[in-house]
UniProtKB/Swiss-Prot annotation:
This is Protein E6. Keywords: Cell wall, Secreted. It comes from Gossypium hirsutum (Upland cotton). Its main location: secreted. Residues 40-64, 210-238 are annotated as: Disordered. One of its GO terms (cellular component) is extracellular region.
Amino acid sequence: MASSPKLFSMSILFLFALFSMQIHAREYFSKFPRVNINEKETTTREQKHETFVPQTTQKPEEQEPRFIPETQNGYGLYGHESGSSRPSFTTKETYEPYVTPVRFHPDEPYNSIPESSNNKDTYYYNKNAYESTKQQNLGEAIFTEKGWSTKENQNNNYYNGNNGYNNGEKQGMSDTRYLENGKYYYDVKSENNYYPNRFDNSRGVASRNEFNENRYNNMGRYHQNQEEFEESEEEFEP
């Protein structure tokens, strides 16, 4: 009988110690934050569904504000934004140079001649482009032989052939050296060049009138100075 109350008291003490240990354990673990396993799982699952968008992949329109010009015409080429509209003109891709139409003559020295020549009866040039078909450039033969003479006819130029310095032909109607029936005769060779001119006297007209004081007298024709003939005229009686 004596062992039963002892045993009862021991069991009561054991139960009391057990409950007191549970109370102290709760107080001890209450100091640490509680982590619920169910809440962890829900948070991780929610993070998997979220999509992370970096800032670099965002559109530039959202990053920078759109610039609007103050003018109504806008900016860029021809008042439009670059790339918004094409220019109003079109450029030709192929370029063909201008070529003068020519025809070739293998027999002629200059074989490249334009088809259209300047011919309106004023200045027409022949195919060789040197000599005129119409007598525009008369050269040295402009007047008659007794006026402005050519180079081939040197009857009255500088030296007058066999007649010494002067030609003994009759010099026009006013020449009084030869009259009717040979009544009057004048020795032409007696004029021994006493005049200050170098080659011919004042009566003669040299080529181009280069050495006469009476220069360009009546367009180079052989008109004589009547005053000098009146002084030197001699009468001859047969």
